[in-house]
UniProtKB/Swiss-Prot annotation:
Its cofactor is Ni(2+). This is Putative nickel-responsive regulator 3. Transcriptional regulator. It comes from the Archaea.
Length: 140
């Protein structure tokens, strides 16, 4: 059960807010606040799932970032070199003049994979990142 509501302020780019407003309208939320609460719950759930990544895993990190952000491309390369023992392959796609999409295929210890993903997520200029893994011994 949730406790009393707290009022907060958030600064967002116009384009992000416009897209969010479209989604909350399509989903039938009664207000932006309800949409934001739902988004935060989803983020918390994903973060808790990430905390449970243990054992041998295979997976991907998908990243969209602004390559014009000073030092970002080098920081991404440094992280990938640091965790090169986990990386099996990567694909780099130029989305437009400023934005790149990268998919990194991983195989190794779940804790280290999580560390790599969190290091990328923390970089300024990363617009989107998503870690997806599966235990390598799961039967499909």
């Amino acid at each position: 059960m949730e406790t009393e509501l707290m009022r907060i302020g958030v600064s967002l780019p116009d384009t992000l807010l416009s897209k969010f407003d479209e989604i909350i309208e399509k989903r039938g939320y009664s207000s932006r606040s309800e949409g934001i609460r739902d988004a935060i719950r989803s983020y918390i759930s994903y973060y808790e799932w990430m905390g449970d990544i243990k054992g041998h895993r295979v997976g991907t990190v998908a990243v969209i970032y602004d390559h014009t952000k000073r030092g970002l491309s080098n920081a991404l390369a440094d992280i990938q070199h640091h965790y090169s023992h986990l990386i099996k392959s990567s694909v780099h796609i130029h989305l437009d003049h400023d934005n790149c999409f990268e998919v990194i295929v991983l195989d190794g210890d779940g804790e280290e994979i999580k560390e790599l993903a969190e290091a990328i997520m923390a970089l300024k200029g990363v617009k989107f990142s998503k870690l997806t893994t599966v235990a390598s011994n799961e039967k499909i």
